[in-house]
Amino acid sequence: MLAKTKHQATIVVKPTFRAVATASVMVLHGAANAAEIKVLSSRGAEQAYRELVPRFENETGHKVTTIFTGALDVQKRIAAGETYDLIIMGGSGIDDFIKAGKVVRGSRVDLAKSGVGVGVRAGAPKPDISSTEALKKALLSAKSIGYSTGNSGVYIASLFERLGIAAELAPKLRQTPTGVFVGSIVATGEAEIGIQQVGELTHFDGVDFLGPLPAAVQQITVFSSGVQVGANEVEAAMHG
């Protein structure tokens, strides 16, 4: 059974984290005793992930230590040689790591799906974003627009081009540094409207979530996990 948050097109979580984390325990030499599982995760599925991890820890006695950061920083950390048991990010990123020999082939597990959503500062007027035309009007009327360097930011930049409004919006775009929530600049008023993965906006203090992008222009990102090559002699552990 799939569990959903209260917002449609937001995050759909498969209850498979136990299986993924159990696989990482295999990586830790099949230890029978409580193990520490090191996870590097992008922020897109953070809320859903945080809901699953305590249950897993209580059921198994294993400890999960997680670093949450932006997708670009995940790539930089792995490129710099940092080692973890599991990596969680957009599925395409995991696939790229597999091709590069950084993640064990066959270890990818899809964990969650997330759409892109829109938010404004708490208490601010709430523009209509229920249709593509309404969204365009809201964006063109906004004094400033926040978006991220992650998957949603790449998509949003291409969407502005597709809608034919990129040039008009360019002077008022505010892109957050990697690992920084768009909600943080919406909450302070630096950005009048913020656009990011739904799970990164719905639980941010100081932000009123307007809803997901209209279906016609929505993009769903699949967040996946993969076992990092070289983590605790992973090949021997998985095949031994």
Placement of each model-derived feature along the sequence:
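Exported/periplasmic ABC-transporter solute-binding proteins
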Residues: 34-72, 76-80, 91-101, 105, ...
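Dinucleotide-binding Rossmann-like beta1-alpha1 core, especially the glycine-rich loop
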Residues: 84
